[in-house]
Amino acid sequence: MVGRSNLSRRRFERLVRRALAALPEEFRSRLENVAVVIEDEPPEDMPDTLGLYEGIPLTERSLADVTLPDVITIFKGPIERTCHTEEDIEDEVRLTVLHEVGHFFGLEEAQLE
């Protein structure tokens, strides 16, 4: 089944929602103004990207900042292609959501590993 998941979009969305709901309340409450979206594929210049945070991390914001809403995008296609089973997909979705939420809170790549 590697790279050939038949996971429906609805099921994938549930996995993302479940990963977000599993976050501790003190983190979830800070994500109210963060849009979490699911796309089938990442941009062509980032074909293996599983997730993407776009915005200004909380640690870099000031009161004077006027920013667009932050966006976390989870890419269904690359996640499915890297996973062997539906359980693997569920685990990868959870890890990817945590990783991108970590960027929102200002964690760097090395801290997220």
Language-model features and meaning:
Residues 1-92, 104, 110-113:
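Active-site rim/adjacent substrate-binding subdomains
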